[in-house]
Swiss-Prot record:
The keyword Hydrolase applies. Its EC number is 3.6.4.-. Interacts with the RNAP. Has a higher affinity for the core RNAP than for the holoenzyme. Its ATPase activity is stimulated by binding to RNAP. SUPFAM superfamilies: P-loop containing nucleoside triphosphate hydrolases (SSF52540). It comes from the Bacteria. GO terms for biological process: regulation of DNA-templated transcription. The lineage of its organism: Bacteria, Pseudomonadati, Pseudomonadota, Gammaproteobacteria, Pasteurellales. It is an enzyme of class 3 (hydrolase). Residues 163-337 form the Helicase ATP-binding domain. GO terms for molecular function: ATP binding; DNA binding; helicase activity; hydrolase activity, acting on acid anhydrides. This is RNA polymerase-associated protein RapA. It comes from Histophilus somni (strain 2336). Residues 489-643 form the Helicase C-terminal domain.
Length: 966
């Protein structure tokens, strides 16, 4: 290289430094200053990663004073360039030394980079093209936002997520039974809305005890980084340095906070209302008490928020558990105009009873009675269903009957009263759950406990609830006493653990202290590997404990958890549950069992309850088991019966006499059977069908499973890491560690931690080991990796050697990749119809396009890399021909680009018009179709077609190919 002071060069490895000036040179080194970034670099003369910047006639330059000009002529004097230029602002011709050029410069156009000899490796060009193709495919994939979460492929969850996630400003009630995954459904809906850029700002309101659960779930399952808001965090905004009070709720886009906290802090509630959120999620919404005369403060606050936030998801208990009045209150939050009166709602619900019977007949495949046919015809009055009814009641073959029943069912689902607002799945409707097997262990109460109870009773220092926890009563008398040395429950637990050496066991205690002391007992007595898990631990500590418990080899056999600490954590890989303490109400009991009894559990669940004879513990266990059957079945009526029988139950639990207790249990059991029967009769089978998605939902799960099994993502991602310079260490067991390095092509890889991260592409492994990142096309690391390539300069210009004995040596081909794209507001989601679409051309020296005859992969197999020095010479020699071919490509691209844009317009028009027409048809029979939803869609269609009509194309990258015989 020939250097001279004053010459302008750019760094090949650090493009962001700008245009440099040679400031010094000796026998071994060259010094270059980069004024734009205020940096100085010293390079070895022989290997300086620099490229000389020399503009040519017709190029546009920028002067340091800011004006632009077109190069008319170029002169070299003493190795320095002088340009005769014509200013663009006043047409004046003026001579400019290269030292006067603006310091801020970047060669982002592929032809500029090529002619300034900023040539990328051939493999970089290939990666860029593949990244563009994958980006296009992912934008248009119907699985986007559904496949990327760390969860099993559960059809009903995927169906609800897809159905709700694709709506504009969805407002729905998610009311699945416990254990069916409402949180996952909400997360998938949220993820779809975020990826589609329909929403940006999200507020999640939860009970205080569930804040960390949601924080962990959103991060671990969906890679969403929420912020936890409380008074301490918000107080920092109250005394700003500039004395202008700021709203803390606008500081973050994704926020979780406790609803009770907002209720108790009116100032914060007001700030949340002014936060301009796009989506509101409320967990445990059934706790919002309401009556026509006196709604609770919490209910009114959520009502105010739902009035100013367009999209609302309410997670709640099933309507059967809530009762009709409470169920109406949730629907009123979603659409107060539609659900304006409870009496009107009651009357409307009664109208669906005959329909429910007809649905039952359709499901049971009986012949439809005349009455049932009339009711169906009345409900579907806008269409002629007579042909379908005839097929169902005829001697037609089974397949024809199924098609007719399916079409009727589909029409009923679309027109069902609350079908668009309410989704509710039951275990009976979903099925596939394992059995729950109850083991009661009856033990003698140690004399140490009995003596402590007697003494404290005499002193009047014992409260009734404390009788459930004799070890705590014992420690009241002697805080340092080690109760676990004589408590028979501990020896029984140790024996159980030793007898189940290959099994994982979850033990739930009432409090953190007992869990910690039990861990000490297991460790000191038998050296059993165990972990503790409670609310006093940080999220990171709980994550470690959970990961330790999940490890199959060298992991903890036992996890000892407090009841609060275990909330929201699921351990489906275990099937043995020990309830060291019994919760004091059926809903909490179901939550405890629900840690194991969830979607994804493949084995029967063994539930162990060690109790002391003749104590409140064993009587409560008896009432749960014989009265409610709450251990071996889910008990949706448990809360109702507990409220009705709670006072009487407390009397029996705290009384020394057990007279009539058995009779009381029998009465409870009869009421339980009656309520169960009423719930079964009241099952809304049509709603269940709408909620579980049927065959389509199963197909959706299958499609994602097929994509999970493809190696395309793995091949692309590992190649991406290789080229960017991310270090990879294969750990075996389908996992690798990826870490940033100092030699990466980019200064930072968004989403990749400095200390590295362990990842897997295997869904089952990711479910079993929470510490692994689950890489999918939706994962931030993959999406950010694609963005790094397509939004940067990597692979924009390349030169390759084509080994082909049939072609004359030196034959020139030019491969060009254009991008067809539309500029539009995020919320329109035009990428569904026209994502940034790569259009490849392959021109010969005459300008003929050979791309249809020679595929990208077919050509790539024949190419070899070309050295930098040789490539630079080729570009210099062939520049005129290359420039001519680039001009020719601008003509070649017009027709195919216009065709792609026209196809996108047709797709947008068909898709949006079909949805608008469907909603208009439904609106006539289903009041849940909001007028504003149709208006939004119509506006969206008009604007979408206008913007697609303005779509354009640009040259993204190019590759010069020169043939050789060998």
């Amino acid at each position: 290289m020939l250097f001279a002071i004053g010459q302008r060069w750019i760094s090949e490895s650090e493009n962001s430094l700008g245009l440099g000036i040679i400031t010094g040179q000796d026998n071994r080194t060259v010094t270059i200053s980069f004024p734009a970034s205020d940096e100085i670099r010293i390079y070895a003369l022989a290997s300086a990663p620099l490229t000389r910047v020399l503009f040519q006639k017709g190029d546009e330059i920028t002067h340091q004073l800011g004006w632009k000009a077109k190069v008319v002529d170029v002169m070299i004097r003493n190795e320095l360039a002088f340009y005769l230029v014509q200013r663009l602002d006043n047409n004046e011709e003026i001579a400019v030394q290269e030292m006067e050029l603006a310091h801020q410069i970047s060669f982002s156009k592929p032809q500029d980079r090529l002619f300034s000899t900023q040539i990328d490796r051939n493999e970089h060009f290939v990666l860029r093209y593949k990244a563009l193709k994958h980006q296009q495919e992912q934008f248009q994939s119907s699985l986007r936002g559904l496949r990327g979460n760390r969860a099993g492929l559960i059809p009903h969850q995927l169906h609800i997520a897809q159905e709700v996630g694709r709506r504009i400003a969805p407002r729905v009630l998610l009311a699945d039974e416990v254990g069916l995954g409402k949180t996952i459904e909400a997360g998938m809906i949220l993820q779809q809305q975020l990826l589609a850029e329909k929403v940006q700002r999200v507020l999640i309101l939860v009970p205080e005890t569930l804040q960390h659960q949601w924080l962990v779930e959103m991060l671990r399952r969906f890679n969403l980084h929420f912020s936890l808001f409380d008074e301490e965090r918000c107080a920092d905004f109250d005394n700003p340095e500039d004395h202008v009070e700021a709203n803390p709720f606008v500081a973050e886009n994704l926020i979780i906070c406790a609803l009770d906290w907002l209720v108790q802090q009116p100032k914060r509630a007001k700030q949340a209302l002014a936060g301009e959120f796009d989506l509101l999620i409320v967990d445990e919404a059934h706790h919002l008490t309401w009556s026509e005369d006196s709604p609770s403060i919490a209910y009114e606050l959520v009502m105010q928020l739902s009035a100013v936030i367009p999209a609302v998801l309410l997670l709640t208990a099933t309507p059967e558990q809530l009762g009709q009045q409470s169920h109406f209150a949730r629907l009123h939050l979603l659409d107060p105009n539609r659900f304006y009166s409870y009496r009107a709602f009651e009357k409307e619900q009664q109208q669906y009873q005959p329909v429910a019977k007809a649905v039952q007949s359709l499901l049971s495949e009986h012949i439809l009675t005349v009455e049932e046919q009339n009711h169906l015809a009345e409900l579907l009055s806008e269409q002629d269903i007579e042909p379908m009814l005839k097929v169902i009641n005829s001697q037609a073959d089974t397949e024809q009957k199924q098609v007719a029943r399916g079409e009727l069912m589909s029409n009923l689902i679309d027109r069902h009263g609350t079908g668009r607002l309410l989704f509710r799945n039951t275990r009976q409707g979903v099925q596939g759950f394992p059995h729950r097997i109850y083991h009661q262990i009856k033990l003698d109460l140690p004399t140490q406990y009995q003596n402590a109870i007697n003494v404290l009773k005499m002193l009047g220092e014992i409260k009734d609830p404390e009788l459930f926890y004799p070890e705590q009563i014992f420690q009241k008398m002697n805080a340092d006493a080690t109760w676990w040395r004589f408590d028979p429950r501990v020896d029984w637990l140790i024996h159980l653990v030793k007898s189940l050496r290959e099994e994982k066991i979850l033990v739930i205690c009432q409090d953190a202290i007992t869990a910690t002391q039990l861990e000490q007992a297991l460790r000191e007595k038998e050296g059993i590997r165990s972990a503790v898990f409670h609310e006093n631990m940080s999220i990171i500590e709980r994550d470690r404990a959970s990961a330790y418990f999940a490890q199959q080899e060298e992991g903890a056999q036992v996890l000892l958890s407090s009841s609060i600490g275990s909330e929201g954590r699921n351990f489906q890989f275990a099937c043995h549950l020990v309830l060291f303490h019994l919760p004091n109400n059926p809903d909490l009991l179901e939550q405890c069992i629900g840690r194991l009894d969830r979607i994804g559990q493949r084995r029967d669940i063994q539930i162990y309850v060690p109790c002391f004879a003749d104590t409140p513990q064993i009587r409560l266990a008896q009432w749960y088991h014989e009265g409610l059957n709450a251990f071996e079945e889910t008990c949706p009526m448990g809360a109702i019966l507990h409220e009705k029988c709670g006072a009487k139950l407390t009397e029996f639990l705290t009384s020394d006499t057990t007279d009539d207790f058995q009779s009381f249990i029998q009465q409870t059991h009869q009421q339980q059977l009656q309520l169960k029967s009423e719930l079964e009769q009241g099952r809304d089978r049509l709603l269940e069908l709408n909620s579980n998605g049927g065959i389509q939902a199963q197909q959706l799960a299958n499609d994602i499973a097929i994509q999970d099994g493809s190696t395309e993502l793995i091949d692309f991602t590992l190649n991406l890491f290789d080229i960017i310079g991310v270090e990879q260490e294969d750990l075996g067991e389908k996992s690798i560690v990826i870490s940033p390095t100092g030699t990466m092509l980019v200064p930072d890889f968004p989403g990749l931690k400095e200390e590295g991260v362990t990842v897997t592409f295997d869904r089952d492994l990711a479910l079993a080991r929470e510490e692994l990142e689950f890489l999918t096309w939706d994962h931030p690391i993959v999406r950010n990796g694609i963005d790094l390539i397509v939004s940067g300069d990597i692979g924009k210009s390349a030169v390759a050697l084509l080994v082909n004995k049939q072609l004359p040596t030196g034959t020139l081909l030019l491969e060009l990749v254009y991008i067809i794209e539309s500029q539009s507001p995020r919320g329109l989601q035009l990428t569904r119809f026209l994502p940034p679409t790569p259009l490849r051309l392959l021109l010969d020296i005459k300008g003929n396009d050979l791309s249809h005859q020679i595929s990208f992969q077919g050509l790539q197999k024949q190419l070899k890399p070309m050295g930098k020095n040789m490539a630079t010479k080729v570009i210099k020699i062939m520049r005129p021909a290359i420039e001519q071919l680039i001009k020719q490509s601008e003509k070649n691209v017009v027709e195919p680009a216009k065709m792609i844009i026209e196809q996108a317009k047709q797709l947008a028009d068909q898709s949006l018009s079909a949805e608008i027409n469907r909603l208009y048809a439904l609106q006539a029979v289903n009041k849940n179709i909001r007028p504003e939803e149709i208006e939004q869609l119509e506006s969206q269609r008009t604007l979408s077609l206008e913007l697609l009509n303005q779509a354009n194309w640009r040259l993204d990258s190019l590759r010069v190919i020169v043939s050789n015989k060998e």
